[in-house]
Design a protein with these regions (language model features):
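Core catalytic region of metal-dependent phosphoesterases/phosphodiesterases
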Residues: 1-64
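Conserved beta-sheet core of the metallophosphoesterase superfamily
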Residues: 50-58, 63-81, 89-194
Length: 197
């Protein structure tokens, strides 16, 4: 699938999830953190300052926010840099794709490079927990949570030496008084196929 077609499919899926949550969730407010990564990059090499200007993902998030601009229960937070900081209750959470963390497939997995990167970032701006994807590995290392792969094992996962994992995403609960209280998996390989109405 081409990047443009992938963005259109992702928009369709995200619009469906948002509509489902609005119609069935009885939520007063839904906060949507949006971080771009390497998947939608239009340049061969990553850019630092101008990364959002060349990101199909960043464009998609802005199109979604525009599409839902009249829905007062939705609040989009779209990163203009590789990281986005948002408070959950009084806990500062760092959201990022994760592709800016160097990892060469070492024995300790992503844990050691991620802990090192977080320690460096926390010197400038501390976060209670960092949420990341990119590495196709569902992991909870205390002050960071890595999301699994929505589609499961694939060629990229093999290239980065990721262990086989079923298609899944992380589900995290943060308690107002106790902080992170639960991390569990939402398995995505049994979901019904997407159909157009």
């Amino acid at each position: 699938m081409s990047p443009v077609k992938a963005i259109l499919l992702a928009m369709d899926l995200l619009n469906g999830v948002i509509k489902h949550l609005l119609d069935n969730g009885n939520f007063e407010r839904i906060t949507v953190p949006c971080c771009f990564g390497n998947h939608g990059r239009l340049t061969h090499k990553p850019r630092a300052k101008t990364a959002p200007d060349t990101s199909l993902e960043w464009m998609m998030y802005n199109l979604l926010a525009t599409h839902w601009k009249h829905e007062k229960r939705l609040v989009f937070h779209i990163a203009d840099a590789v990281q986005l900081y948002l408070p959950v209750f009084e806990y500062p959470i760092r959201f990022m794709h994760g592709d800016d963390v160097s990892y060469g497939g070492g024995v300790g997995g992503i844990t050691i490079p991620m802990r090192r990167a977080i320690a460096d970032w926390d010197k400038t701006k501390r976060a209670y927990c960092s949420m990341f994807g990119h590495f196709h590995t569902a992991v909870d290392i205390g002050n960071a949570i890595g999301n699994g792969s929505l589609i499961g094992a694939n060629a990229y996962g093999v290239r980065i030496h990721a262990a086989y994992e079923p298609p899944r995403q992380q589900f995290v609960l943060i308690d107002q008084k106790r902080g992170k209280s639960s991390v569990s998996h939402i398995y995505t390989d049994y979901l019904p196929p997407v159909t157009k109405e």
